[in-house]
Amino acid sequence: MGARAVLGVTLAVACAGAFFASILRRKDLLGGDTEASGVAGLVEASRLLVDEAIHTTMRRNLRKRGIFSPSQLLSFSKLPEPTSRTASRAAEIMETAVQEVKRRVCRRRDTDQLPTDVLSEELLSTIANLSGCLPHMLPPSCPHTCLANKYRLITGACNNRDHPRWGASNTALARWLPPAYEDGVTEPRGWNPHFLYNGLPLPPVREVTRQVIHVSNEAVTEDGQYSDLLMAWGQYIDHDIAFTPQSTSKAAFAGGADCQLTCENRSPCFPIQLPTNASGAAGATCLPFYRSSAACGSGRQGALVGNLSWAAPRQQMNGLTSFLDASTVYGSSPAQEQRLRNWTSAEGLLRVNTRHRDAGRAFLPFAPPPAPPACAPEPGTPAARAPCFLAGDSRASEVPGLTALHTLWLREHNRLAAAFKALNAHWSADTVYQEARKVVGALHQIVTLRDYVPKILGAEAFGQHVGPYQGYDPAVDPTVSNVFSTAAFRFGHATIHPLVRRLDARFQEHPGSHLPLRAAFFQPWRLLREGGVDPVLRGLLARPAKLQVQDQLMNEELTERLFVLSNSGTLDLASINLQRGRDHGLPGYNEWREFCGLSRLETWADLSAATANGRVADRILGLYQHPDNIDVWLGGLAESFLPGARTGPLFACIIGKQMRALRDGDRFWWENPGVFTEAQRRELSRHSMSRVICDNSGLSHVPLDAFRVGQWPQEFEPCASIQGMDLGAWREAPPSGDACGFPDPVEDGGFLLCEERGQRVLVFSCRHGFRLRGPAQITCTPRGWDSPPPLCKDINECEDETDPPCHASARCKNTKGGVLCECSDPLVLGEDGRTCVDAGRLPRASVVSIALGAVLVCGLAGLAWTVVCRWTHADARPLLPVGEGEGDGKSPSLPLPGCGNRRDVGAAPALEVEQDLSCGSRGLCE
């Protein structure tokens, strides 16, 4: 018994000793604090560091308004919407905090100890929570109403019931192969100048562009089969399924260096180094480049996620839904959707431009403040008056062809909505909106999978990698993959023509109608002032795309003049693509060939056969020196085409695999039984891109297949002969035979009708910024509705202390359905709409004070001047000869120099000395 007691006491003492030693060790590693306070302080310090870098970026951007440098335009095109920005900021705070834990651990110990060995799982989760990442890592709450099977959520969440985050916006891009970071976790390929691949350094991306990719504008070959619309649709549909935001900061987190100026790799700055025999504008030795934002719970944050290890690599975020769902039209977040809808309409319409019309048709609305005025102003107008267009994707104003497609689909939604309301007067505005949105999404799917992708892959590869539709498969993850978004689908950049062709009503060119691409970047005023959408559409239909030829990959409008609106610099799209692949840690070309079941290329002969061009193989191997080192985007781009295709075997495999996943993993795919009726599916299949153009533009003739280049007029058909949908398939009889009818409209909300167990059900929702008070759904019973409808009450976001809508630098003012962040003069609201920044100007009160002071000083000076001059005049008068005053006709009156009179040349020089003496000094008088 005594021995047991002694043993028990010994074990207790040992455990207590180990426990307190563990506490002391953790306290020491966190800089002397206990776990909780140490972690909280560390996260707060990381938040301050990240926010200061973001604040510095916004301050610099404000001071550069009106200076349209290419890097600034690129930044605007990659500007995330607020929900994505919040997720990106949280990921950066989280990663910065964990990097600091790692640094402290390594500094105090010789071993490469992991944060998971130092902090408890509870405190690791605390870091995720304090940084703001946790909400972006948890599964969303999915609705269980009868609408769950009728309409997709705007965020794409809950499409898959078992994996509700699959395909949702603001989640990580999928990885089909493990990434190849230089430290295994986060550092891009090419980050460390002395890091070797197969014993060799990677070539600078700018040198790859110059030697392999670049071709002059005059040397391009045109596609004899496909129209420029094929290229434009590829860009448009890419913007429907993928958007990887750049870091929210353009200043280094450590030290605040400006990423537009520094040539050092200091996250998030990852500049493109220029060859030693070349320099950029003003002698620059690099081009600016910013890393893509990490997704929450990846990279050095991986240790903080339950089932992930420390080695979980950095992932990149997709700010859009992965699905082909027309997010280009409707957005990918509730806040964005709210900005796009016309809430005063009973027809479920989208907002249109209220200042400009296109021959009676709608233009896209302008983006409201505080969006930066990044679009180029019309010549002769102030730079501050150059808003970009507002659409579901922030890149809608990049080039006229892209803007034209956004405009077409805005008009198509409103056309369908008006027709549906005319057919079904009993439909609520929300029902009309959702039904039109559902049809527009289906048309995006049809045009892409039926008409576009087979032309890109070729019939054989399409059958192999995509094949016929077999129905929805809940085991298929539809999430857009990193290699698809960052490499394979960027093949389209090699099909961009250096000219924007605009044609008149007879499809003829005229002087000044064509624009070099550099004169069209971010210039929406050209559509407003130079003929509207129709001339651009005619050019897309009747002029060929550029053909992707191995030794003519990208023209100089993209490699030398990307986003160039002035002489303030340049960017190179080819180098950006290569650098982005390295930033994302994409494995090399051979790894992806093996992934697709293709043979690895080991020799020059192998590469020469794959490209069908020995000269190109020479150039590539001359730079990379080993086939395994070739960047996947370049390798896939250089492959010779498959039969009837516009890609080689590698990109055909990756694009086909992705498109099949987008189709088979989408519960709301248009062909999935139950999404549409059989009659509706039949009508949808009759529609085409040509019909959309006929219905929403001034064109009276179009090709039957809008993606095949047509010769005017013999290969164009009148719009009357282009078949389309009969919307009668969407006619519904109004409910009858019950005691319910329809309730009164809900202010700041709406309702949708569906059936549940044979009973009519109304499901209510509120606009963004409002909260339901009352039941979310009511059911029709024999005695009427089982409950009165709910109310929509405004949410006071300013009371949210866990996730405040405004930065601490701003005052929060609640508004109906939203919030307004206000700044005290001289601070102004930054581009994020929540932070006050210094614009580098004096306060308005100071300006007024200075102006009043200047007036006072001038007044006093004038008074003093008057006194001096009167005194001078009085002293000088006795020196005048008697009888020679004014009006005697003998002598002109003498001027008083400097006292307000006009000096007459040659007047009484003998009296100058006396006048000077009486004034006191010539300087005073003058």
Swiss-Prot record:
<feature type="binding site" description="covalent">
    <location>
        <position position="238"/>
    </location>
    <ligand>
        <name>heme b</name>
    </ligand>
</feature>
<dbReference type="GO" id="GO:0006979">
    <property type="term" value="P:response to oxidative stress"/>
</dbReference>
<dbReference type="GO" id="GO:0005615">
    <property type="term" value="C:extracellular space"/>
</dbReference>
<feature type="transmembrane region" description="Helical">
    <location>
        <begin position="845"/>
        <end position="869"/>
    </location>
</feature>
<dbReference type="Pfam" id="PF03098">
    <property type="entry name" value="An_peroxidase"/>
</dbReference>
<keyword id="KW-0732">Signal</keyword>
<dbReference type="InterPro" id="IPR037120">
    <property type="entry name" value="Haem_peroxidase_sf_animal"/>
</dbReference>
<keyword id="KW-0376">Hydrogen peroxide</keyword>
<feature type="binding site">
    <location>
        <position position="240"/>
    </location>
    <ligand>
        <name>Ca(2+)</name>
    </ligand>
</feature>
<feature type="signal peptide">
    <location>
        <begin position="1"/>
        <end position="14"/>
    </location>
</feature>
<dbReference type="InterPro" id="IPR000742">
    <property type="entry name" value="EGF-like_dom"/>
</dbReference>
<keyword id="KW-0893">Thyroid hormones biosynthesis</keyword>
<dbReference type="InterPro" id="IPR001881">
    <property type="entry name" value="EGF-like_Ca-bd_dom"/>
</dbReference>
<feature type="disulfide bond">
    <location>
        <begin position="142"/>
        <end position="158"/>
    </location>
</feature>
<dbReference type="GO" id="GO:0016020">
    <property type="term" value="C:membrane"/>
</dbReference>
<keyword id="KW-0408">Iron</keyword>
<feature type="topological domain" description="Cytoplasmic">
    <location>
        <begin position="870"/>
        <end position="926"/>
    </location>
</feature>
<dbReference type="GO" id="GO:0006590">
    <property type="term" value="P:thyroid hormone generation"/>
</dbReference>
<feature type="disulfide bond">
    <location>
        <begin position="694"/>
        <end position="719"/>
    </location>
</feature>
<dbReference type="GO" id="GO:0004447">
    <property type="term" value="F:iodide peroxidase activity"/>
</dbReference>
<feature type="glycosylation site" description="N-linked (GlcNAc...) asparagine">
    <location>
        <position position="342"/>
    </location>
</feature>
<feature type="binding site">
    <location>
        <position position="325"/>
    </location>
    <ligand>
        <name>Ca(2+)</name>
    </ligand>
</feature>
<dbReference type="GO" id="GO:0020037">
    <property type="term" value="F:heme binding"/>
</dbReference>
<comment type="subunit">
    <text>Interacts with DUOX1, DUOX2 and CYBA.</text>
</comment>
<feature type="domain" description="EGF-like; calcium-binding">
    <location>
        <begin position="794"/>
        <end position="837"/>
    </location>
</feature>
<keyword id="KW-0812">Transmembrane</keyword>
<keyword id="KW-0245">EGF-like domain</keyword>
<feature type="disulfide bond">
    <location>
        <begin position="823"/>
        <end position="836"/>
    </location>
</feature>
<feature type="binding site" description="axial binding residue">
    <location>
        <position position="493"/>
    </location>
    <ligand>
        <name>heme b</name>
    </ligand>
</feature>
<keyword id="KW-0349">Heme</keyword>
<feature type="binding site" description="covalent">
    <location>
        <position position="398"/>
    </location>
    <ligand>
        <name>heme b</name>
    </ligand>
</feature>
<keyword id="KW-1015">Disulfide bond</keyword>
<feature type="disulfide bond">
    <location>
        <begin position="806"/>
        <end position="821"/>
    </location>
</feature>
<dbReference type="InterPro" id="IPR010255">
    <property type="entry name" value="Haem_peroxidase_sf"/>
</dbReference>
<feature type="site" description="Transition state stabilizer">
    <location>
        <position position="395"/>
    </location>
</feature>
<keyword id="KW-0479">Metal-binding</keyword>
<comment type="similarity">
    <text>Belongs to the peroxidase family. XPO subfamily.</text>
</comment>
<feature type="glycosylation site" description="N-linked (GlcNAc...) asparagine">
    <location>
        <position position="277"/>
    </location>
</feature>
<dbReference type="GO" id="GO:0042744">
    <property type="term" value="P:hydrogen peroxide catabolic process"/>
</dbReference>
<keyword id="KW-0768">Sushi</keyword>
<feature type="binding site">
    <location>
        <position position="321"/>
    </location>
    <ligand>
        <name>Ca(2+)</name>
    </ligand>
</feature>
<feature type="disulfide bond">
    <location>
        <begin position="766"/>
        <end position="792"/>
    </location>
</feature>
